[in-house]
Amino acid sequence: MTQYLPPNLLALFAAREPIPFMPPVDKLPHEKKSRGYLGVAKFMADFEDPKDTPLPKTVETRQERLERRRREKAEQVAYKLEREIALWDPTEIKNATEDPFRTLFIARINYDTSESKLRREFEFYGPIKKIVLIHDQESGKPKGYAFIEYEHERDMHAAYKHADGKKIDSKRVLVDVERARTVKGWLPRRLGGGLGGTRRGGNDVNIKHSGREDNERERERYRLEREREDREGPGRGGGSNGLDARPGRGFGAERRRSRSRERRDRERDRGRGAVASNGRSRSRSRERRKRRAGSRERYDEFDRRDRRDRERERDRDREREKKKKRSKSRERESSRERRERKRERRDRERGTGSGGDVKERKPDFRDMDVIKIKEEPVDDGYPTFDYQNATIKREIDDEDEEKYRPPPAHHNMFSVPPPPILGRGNASTNPNPDNGQQSSGDPSWWRQ
């Protein structure tokens, strides 16, 4: 088909010129002459000595970097803690109370509790000299603990014994003695010391009950709970170690030893400051015995009050249980049975209380098929009507009613006497025809 195309189109299908040949610059690979493979011994002198080779650079991984930062932070905290322990002196606190042996420590206070509320709650045990409610120095918010100084040491002991676990503003407080100035070597919790097991670690080691650490009953109950959780399994109890394996097991013994040391130190100080006079020593011993007797009486009074309160609570619980039982039994009964029983009891009481005369009760129209008619009050300006002696119109029964019967065919309709016309009188009573009325026998009188 292309041979029939015009020349201008045939030029489009013409072949291109071939590429011109150029001689190669180098010899071809098969034309070259090689000397074969040689060793590298002669090049060993060009390498450096292995002794002079630098050590490889190690790159720190992500885990190593996190561990390094954690270690550095722990070192800084330990250094700061050591420095604060060296500078800490509880005797130089500005807001501290005067006598530490008459000071009570109150913890776990509600943040909304005010100083006046604490005073009202703790003045029950004795007169209070000073209350120090601790606040944050930066934000000014309460920290949840306070110090209360009593005027007498026996009042402080009474509050220490009876106020522990008291609920103030819907929160149970913890009561303890001040230990910063009474126990040698004592440190607060922020410096690594302190007592209590609520912030030891996780849920498996923290103590959940509210109260002092030496509360043997609470500790025993908590230990039994931990053993029961361990028996149920680690999946439900949250740990396989019991209470005996936790750190800080001997806090109660340590606190008892610290109290005994406090007592010995106070007695030794009193012995040093005492005068050698026999009279003054006897008077002081007499005063001491009086104080002990007073504190003992105060303790006995508190114990009696506690027993009375517990008995009242038990009585109230019994009354509540009885009321619940009575209410349940009432709910089971139907309303009609209750109404009948009340009516019988009321009739019985009225019959026995008034010498046997039973008062007639009003009929209960709810149980009777009686229709009660409402009576209106009698008007003063109108006479009364006796309905009992009045004549009552009675309707005729259908059987006795006289049915309408049409007149016979021979009967003249005009023979029926018309009704009397007023003013004309009656023919039977006035037969005189001059009055304008015809006799009843004349049927055509009314047509005139």
UniProtKB/Swiss-Prot annotation:
Compositionally skewed regions (Basic and acidic residues) per UniProt: 206-234, 262-272, 294-320, 346-376
PROSITE patterns: RRM
SMART domains: RRM
Main location: nucleus
Its job: Mediates the splicing of pre-mRNA by binding to the stem loop I region of U1-snRNA. Required during oogenesis for nurse cell chromatin dispersal.
Alphabetized InterPro entries for the sequence: Nucleotide-bd_a/b_plait_sf, RBD_domain_sf, RRM_dom, snRNP70_RRM, U1_U11-U12_snRNP_70-35kDa, U1snRNP70_N
Protein's UniProt name: U1 small nuclear ribonucleoprotein 70 kDa
Keywords: mRNA processing, Nucleus, Ribonucleoprotein, RNA-binding
Domain notes from UniProt: Protein interactions mediated by the Arg-rich domain are not essential for viability, but do contribute to an essential U1 snRNP function.
Cellular component GO terms held in the UniProt record: catalytic step 2 spliceosome; nuclear speck; nucleus; precatalytic spliceosome; spliceosomal complex; U1 snRNP; U2-type prespliceosome
Organism of origin: Drosophila melanogaster
Domain RRM: 102-180
GO molecular function per UniProt: mRNA binding; RNA binding; U1 snRNA binding
